[in-house]
Amino acid sequence: IALAQPGEETDMIVYCSTQHPTEAQHGVSKVLGIPINEVTIEVRRMGGAFGGKESQSTIIAAAAALAAAKTKRPVKIRLRRDDDMVITGKRHDFEFKYVVGIDDDGRIEGIDLDMAMRSGNVADLSPGVLGRALCHGDNCYYLPNVRLNGYPCKTNTVSNTAFRGFGAPQGML
């Protein structure tokens, strides 16, 4: 949900549901072509998004602000729940290919792991998610020999985004 209301001169006030007001402010500023200090983002309350409203709510906020700037009237955008579920990104899918080295006693001596991550049509928060997955690739094991590679894959699907765990669950072995 986003409600954009024109202020004085080119100022814009946007009430939106976001976990990252600064990113929404930057997005609205860029779309309207106005300085960041002319954009005010207000968030009444936020909870339960688990990362899902960190970046993707900026699109709705910017769209409402653009319509409000063009019409010089307040504009509210509220997506139907099923539309919101289709448009909003989900947890990143990963595909793994690996080779594990084991000694004669059954101890893991090393791993060679490739992680391919479906990012979607734009990067969004994919670099951070992939970085976190790579950091968790060895999980709780001491592995004397490790090679981890991560590949963010651009696809024709909706952009995936932050989601509870932010790459850690995908990266754990």
What do these predicted regions represent?
Residues I1-L173:
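Structural alpha/beta core scaffold segments of enzyme domains
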